[in-house]
Amino acid sequence: MVNMKASMFLTFAGLVLLFVVCYASESEEKEFPKEMLSSIFAVDNDFKQEERDCAGYMRECKEKLCCSGYVCPSRWKWCVLPAPWRR
């Protein structure tokens, strides 16, 4: 019985030690993933979203008209696809 308790304690202590070591090494390398992601997802001015004269899918349509292929139902105030039975 004592041997089983000791082995469980050592297993638990080993897991805690592993967690602490992993956390310490990850906190040292926190800047690397941020730098990597910022370089991958860098936004260029050419790729920014352009302002449209019409509202796209699931956009508010109170002041703007919906783009072609979408409707602005009176029940909801955002552009959605027309219902199949209304086409």
Swiss-Prot record:
Record keyword Secreted present: yes
Subcellular location: Secreted
Extent of the signal sequence: 1-24
Tissue expression pattern: Expressed by the venom gland.
Disulfide bonds: C54-C67, C61-C72, C66-C79
Alphabetically ordered keywords of this record: Disulfide bond, Ion channel impairing toxin, Knottin, Secreted, Signal, Toxin
Propeptide: 25-52
Pfam families: Toxin_12 (PF07740)
Described purpose of this protein according to its UniProt entry: Ion channel inhibitor.
Domain notes: The presence of a 'disulfide through disulfide knot' structurally defines this protein as a knottin.
Family the UniProt entry places it in: Belongs to the neurotoxin 10 (Hwtx-1) family. 51 (Hntx-8) subfamily. Hntx-8 sub-subfamily.
Protein name: U3-theraphotoxin-Hhn1d
Organism (species): Cyriopagopus hainanus
Classification of source organism: Eukaryota, Metazoa, Ecdysozoa, Arthropoda, Chelicerata
